[in-house]
């Protein structure tokens, strides 16, 4: 276990914690992105994370094994049904999880909430998330951005992950980017390859700026 896991920085200002929702289809890279964000931000901010799975706590286990944060700062929630419901129509199970985490870590700067794998219609309740990040992967097909759906068109940040797979699945990244710009208009997006950490810094910068974590 690295020393970074034992060092939790002190907050410089008292503000309600920023709640960041991370959604997207199964296998798109949500958990890997959350791991990368925790590792990139944990020395600067006080972080906690909540993961959603339907019948298991597999994502919680993966983050713990990866050393994203100390185990006590990662909570797994078993939704027992449609993952969309647990982040939108009835977010009570996640709101309760946030309350429990903040009882243990009242100085948290950021609460990450990773949804279970869902479809393009998934969105986070405003009660649950201040910022939303929606993740797709190139292997799902070049056409995904132009299919639309709230995750693609309305999320605060859209992430197109696994760009390294484009040549193997016949996806044209230029076309995906053009379709993304057309569907999202002025809303930001990032192309990522999390295996090489490509794009992670841009996602962190977005969270810091839009979440007003920095004075800049």
UniProtKB/Swiss-Prot annotation:
Keyword Magnesium in record: no
Database matches in Pfam families: cobW
GO MF, one example: GTP binding
Gene3D superfamilies associated with the record: P-loop containing nucleotide triphosphate hydrolases (3.40.50.300)
Subcellular location: Cytoplasm
One GO CC term, this protein: cytoplasm
Keywords from the UniProt entry: Chaperone, Cytoplasm, GTP-binding, Nickel insertion, Nucleotide-binding
Keyword Transport among record annotations: no
Binding annotation for GTP: 24-31
GO biological process: urea catabolic process
CDD domains: UreG (cd05540)
Quaternary structure and interacting proteins, as annotated: Homodimer. UreD, UreF and UreG form a complex that acts as a GTP-hydrolysis-dependent molecular chaperone, activating the urease apoprotein by helping to assemble the nickel containing metallocenter of UreC. The UreE protein probably delivers the nickel.
Family per similarity comment: Belongs to the SIMIBI class G3E GTPase family. UreG subfamily.
Role description: Facilitates the functional incorporation of the urease nickel metallocenter. This process requires GTP hydrolysis, probably effectuated by UreG.
Protein name: Urease accessory protein UreG
